[in-house]
Amino acid sequence: MSSAIAAKTMTQTWQTVCTRADLVPYSGVAAWVETPEGPAQVAIFYLPGHAQELYAIDHHDPFSKANVIARGIVGDLKGQPVVASPIYKQHFRLEDGQCLEDESVQLRAWKVSFKGDEVWIEA
Amino acid sequence: MNTPAKPQLIVIGNGMVGHHLVEQLVEQGATERYTVIVFGEERHLAYDRVHLSEYFSGRDADSLALSTADYYAENGIELRLHEAVTAIDREAGEIVTPKGRYPYARLVLATGSYPFVPPIPGNERDGCLVYRTLEDLDAIREAAESASTGVVVGGGLLGLEAANALRGLNLDTAVVEFAPRLMPMQVDSEGGELLREKIEALGVQVLTGRATQEIVDGERSRHRMVFQDDKVLETDLIVFSAGIRPRDELARDCGLEIGERGGVVIDDNCLTSDPAILAVGEVALWNNSIFGLVAPGYQMAKAAASTLLEGGTAFAGADMSTKLKLMGVDVGSIGDAHGDRTPGARMFRFLDPLKQQYRKLVVSSDGKRLVGAMLVGDNSYYDTLLQYYANRIELPEDPAALILPAGSEAAPALGPDALPATAMICSCHNVTKADVCATIDGGAVDLGAVKGETKASTGCGGCAALLKTLVDHELESRGVEVDKSICEHFHYTRQELYDIVRVEGIKTFSELMEKHGNPETHKLGCDICKPAVASILASCFNEPITDAAHIPLQDTNDTFMANMQKNGTYSVVPRIAGGEITPDKLVVLGQVAQKYNLYTKVTGGQRIDLFGARLEDLPAIWGELIEAGFETGHAYGKSLRTVKSCVGSTWCRYGVQDSVGMAIRLENRYKGLRAPHKIKFGVSGCTRECAEAQSKDIGVIATENGWNLYVSGNGGMRPRHAELFATDLSDEELFRYIDRFLMFYIRTADRLQRTSVWRENLEGGLDYLKEVILEDSLGIGEELERQMQAVVDTYVCEWSNAISDPEKLKRFRSFVNDARPDPDIIYTTERGQLRPA
């Protein structure tokens, strides 16, 4: 288990959070990232073989107020990759965190990418 | 302080119309205004007399019943069956029964009718019976056991029904009719002749124009019937079915106005000559007519209920048009079928002596309206003709085309479009085309929903085909494509996906998606199809759900094999088969709960639920539980949950079988079985039913001789009593039928459909299910048993499997890059235990 190596500056920086082996194909895992505002929980989704293989959005579910988004079912609805909250089943677009059932709710989407086998997030 | 007592409304009679009145009272809210008491003379609650003859072809009293005692109880209506009312004391405002006197503010007579027995000397002899009630049928069945021949006196509608019943009891059957033809009310001499030919071809002797003079001892049989021309007919059994007479004696005795030929006179509001008393159904005489069909009775019931409340719905007479299938022979009669009540009426006739079909149209003198019609041999013309008649639709230029055989110059059937909004679709429940359309506009999306909302086609069922056509048409015209696809990723129903998986041996979601998924999606699936396919794969192949190929398919509960609670923690429920647990194991549960700071609660399924477990603690908790001999309880799965039991014959004074032992065997056999929804069992050791087995998907109740099996019960939001499925089964039979039942359910149910809803939607109902499971009518019994055995043989405890695999345990990290627990899970304490803050 690797610790988050965060650059403690006031600007956003790329940081490594885990490796490919920590991810679960076609599902999500949760990770901590360090941000200028403090630590944050991020849900990382891995879709091997798809045009975009990695997505990261908030792990916090604003409807249940529990940190569970990474444990939802990943799928696609009307052409958009989504995750369904495991508690009350709202769908969030992986691309930008938009909730499909409630226009006013949007999770933060984080930039995420592989560098070799390492997973990097900009936070 | 007592609330003032509500006025008492008494209903005398619990036949079809009497019961319908009760339903109308409930629906229209009369139970808030009145205290309602219903008296029924028979032992049975209201039953379906229209389908009475099916009593001899396998239906029992329960399946003919129109309602349940629970329905009455739930609506606060007192039902007093087997208590005949003997008098009405209008001065005192009371009715009298052998058990006492009951005051009424309002009284409704729904006493119905009795079969008319012609005054023939000898008609009281043993073996001379009538055909009206279930008890009559029991008497006929008993008498038939020592008989080889039977005669029905009366060749009308009920007479032919009775003749069919005798035929069903393997008697050589004859029908004796006083009129020169069969069904003289409905058909003319040509139609009657055709009917005779058809019925004789079925082996039933038909004697028309015969008046029976007397019945005496026979020489070869028990009775000899002597006719007016001194000809004779010998028989062992005689059933009188020569018409009905109103049961108006109570009304007569208390001085209500009675018609010349019987019947309690009512007005349009169903009021008798005493405004406190109403009458409905076959006892009531409206406009000098008795209505001997169920539909007009229902309309009277509706009007009567309205009269008892605000009023507004009057009875305005009823159409006596009818279509029936008597001994497989279609007979239909619409309006003035004989043309003798319409001055200047003109007739069209079509007769095909080879195909044995006869049709007649009675048309108004200007040729524009249909005033009546008669059909023998083919009722497919009925619906269209009835619409022309009932809605006064202008006839085509050549009306004869309406009765010509299809394919000739025949006019096309009247499509649903041609019907006016006022067209009556279901006359039993008074449902018009406009009502059906309104229901669809209100959101009903299929036939079932329309039937549920309007009750259309739930009376005599005669309008079923018309209703379906109309509903399909209306849905289509609103652009509703009746799409049963499970979701956008598969254009298949769950059942179709199940068959594909089974037949093609597909073992993963990705293979199924590759071969059968909708290419217009990203092929990721969704939270609808993924768990459904996961369930199907598990039912068919039973691979661990935590295997890499299956893990992304599972709901979070299955993924982590625990039940997610609202704060993101989980509850843990180890299996306690049959609710039996040793003290040692009980101690372990307490110790684990203490160590991991868990809230504990006893569940409704006789187990212990440990709440508040953090994701990262689950493997350690399970390590300790497995060490102590526990296994997973599948409380998180759409699978067998629990088998609840009472303590049974080992301890209980009343128990007749070892219910705990049976519950444990059942639970161990079916544990781990994944299904469209969760499954619960109950096993009771005697009829006291302490395990509440009749509220379970599978209920087992011990008898002196074995086990009674109940199926498709449910608690929850919409409780449903399980239905008795088979009786006095051996252990082996019990397992065999449950194997078959569950596998058939798994094969054919929709996703997330409990056995109760599945059973209710199953075409053919309980009878069909019995045929498939008990009689193996589809020939799949062994296959189903084999499939179940495969699931049983491949069972492994999912938690044991997971904790022995480090790769699988990686999934139970709350965060992949830090062992820090989730700081947002905060607890407070209540009643000595923790709960989410």
Question: What feature does the model see in each segment?
Answer:
Chain A
Residues M1-G79, R93-L94, Q106-A123:
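N-terminal pre-ligand scaffold of iron-sulfur
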Residues D61, S85-Y88:
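Short cysteine clusters
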